Design a protein with these regions (language model features):
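Accessory alpha-helical/coil subdomains and C-terminal extensions
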Residues: 155-244
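Extended amphipathic secondary-structure runs
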Residues: 245-246, 261-262
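Coiled-coil termination/hinge junctions
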Residues: 248-254
Length: 358
C-alpha cells in the first residue's frame, strides 16, 4: 500500500496538485512539510498547500487535478471526497479512526490499519508521509520532522529504534526520551504556537520547510521563528495556570473519574491543556470546554490509558446537539453550539454512568 502511494506521488505534477493538511496540529504540519519537501527534491518545485480542521475540511473548494489529504480523516466526509474524485485524482494519508475504507470507491486511501500491525492511532501522519516518501527518494535529512508527529500524537513508544537514531543524529535534542518533554516538546510547542498568529499555519509551515535541523528552530534562526517563540511564551503562561489550578476550577466527578473543565482561554491551548492534564493524571477522563465564538463551543476529550474511547465519547455526546467530533481512542475533539453546554455535560455523565454501570 505504501508503494501505491509512492507511485501516485511520482505521477503528480506540482502545478496541478494541492496538499491539504491538518492545520494547527504538529503532526499535520510536519506531514505536510515532509510531502512538500519531497516534491521539491523530486520535481524541483512544490505544489499548493492548504490547511483545514476536521470540522471544516468538507467546505474547501478544491479543483486541482490531484489532491492529497494528509492527517485528516476525510473518509468521514465520504460524499464530499467522492465528489472530488469525479474530476481529481485523490490520495488520502491518514491515521485517525477509520469510518469508511475509500479504497472500495476507487480512491487510494492509505491507513495503517489496512497494512500494518501498529495501531493507526500510534502511526502518526508524519511517519506515514515519511515512509511513503522514503520509497521515492532519499529524505533522511527530514527524519527529525517525523519526531514532531510522533511526540505530538503520542506514538513514540512504538518507534523507539527510529527515535534513538534521530536523537543520536541531532545532539541539540538532548538525551533520548519517549515522553513529551525536553527539547522535542519545546520544538513542538513553538511550531503549534502558530495558531495564535494571523496566517500562523502558513508561518509555521514556512519555518518547517526552511529549517535544516531542530536547532534552526530551537535557536531562533529567523524572524519567523522568533515570532513563533514569542507567541509560545504567552501561551505557556496561561497553560501553566490552568494545569496547576484544575482541581479548584473544574467539575470533578470522582465516581466516574471524569473531569469537565470549562475554561475561558485567551490563547488556543485547549488541546494542549487537555493533553497536559491527561498526562499528569492518566486515570482520569478529561473534557475541556472553551467557547471560541458566540456559536462555537470547542471540546477536547482525553484518556491517555484508553480506559474510555474518546472517539466514541466525542461522537456520542455531541450528536444529539447537532455537533460533530472524532479522533482517536486516547484523544478526540468536537464542536457544538454553546447553548447546549449544560445538556452536553449531562450527556457525558449519562454515557459514562452507563459504561461503568453506576
Amino acid at each position: 500500500m505504501l508503494n501505491l502511494a509512492a507511485d501516485f506521488i511520482k505521477h503528480c505534477k506540482p502545478s496541478e496538485t494541492t496538499i491539504v493538511y491538518h492545520g494547527g496540529c504538529g503532526d499535520g504540519l510536519a506531514a505536510a512539510a515532509i510531502l512538500l519537501r519531497t516534491f521539491q527534491k523530486l520535481f524541483g518545485s512544490m505544489p499548493k498547500a492548504k490547511f483545514a480542521s476536521p470540522s471544516v475540511v468538507s467546505k474547501l473548494n478544491l479543483h486541482n487535478k490531484t489532491i492529497i489529504f494528509v492527517d485528516l480523516a476525510v473518509d468521514q466526509e465520504k460524499d464530499y471526497v467522492l465528489g472530488l474524485a469525479k474530476n481529481s485524482r485523490v490520495l488520502i494519508l491518514d491515521h485517525h479512526q477509520m469510518v469508511n475504507n475509500l479504497n472500495k470507491e476507487g480512491i487510494l486511501h492509505v491507513h495503517p490499519d489496512l497494512f500494518g500491525k501498529i495501531p493507526g492511532v500510534r502511526y502518526p501522519g508524519a511517519k506515514l508521509a515519511f515512509d511513503v516518501c522514503s520509497l521515492i527518494t532519499n529524505i533522511d535529512d527530514l527524519d527529525w520532522l517525523v519526531l514532531i508527529g510522533l511526540f505530538h500524537d503520542v506514538g513514540a513508544e512504538y518507534w523507539k529504534p527510529f527515535i534513538d537514531k534521530v536523537f543520536a543524529k541531532y545532539h541539540e535534542l538532548g538525551k533520548v526520551t519517549y515522553e513529551y518533554k525536553g527539547k522535542i516538546a519545546e520544538l513542538i510547542a513553538i511550531i503549534t504556537a502558530g495558531q495564535e498568529l494571523r496566517r500562523g499555519n502558513e508561518l509555521a509551515l514556512k519555518v518547517l520547510l526552511e529549517a535544516d535541523r531542530p536547532s534552526d528552530i530551537l535557536e531562533a534562526y529567523s524572524p519567523e521563528v522568533e515570532e513563533l517563540i514569542a507567541a509560545n511564551k504567552e501561551r505557556e503562561k496561561e497553560l501553566i495556570y490552568y494545569v496547576e489550578n484544575w482541581e479548584k476550577l473544574a467539575d470533578y466527578n470522582r465516581k466516574l473519574k471524569l473531569v469537565i473543565y470549562d475554561v475561558e482561554l485567551k490563547h488556543k491551548i485547549s488541546s494542549a491543556l487537555s493533553t497536559a492534564l491527561s498526562k499528569r493524571h492518566p486515570d482520569l477522563t478529561f473534557v475541556v470546554m472553551n467557547q471560541e465564538s458566540p456559536s462555537v463551543l470547542k471540546l477536547n476529550f482525553r484518556q491517555t490509558l484508553e480506559k474510555v474511547d474518546c472517539n466514541w465519547l466525542a461522537k456520542a455526546s455531541t450528536e444529539p446537539f447537532g455537533g460533530n467530533g472524532g479522533g482517536h481512542k486516547p484523544a478526540a475533539g468536537a464542536r457544538i453550539h454553546p447553548k447546549f453546554k449544560e445538556k452536553f455535560k449531562e450527556k457525558v455523565r449519562e454515557l459514562l454512568k452507563a459504561k461503568y454501570s453506576i
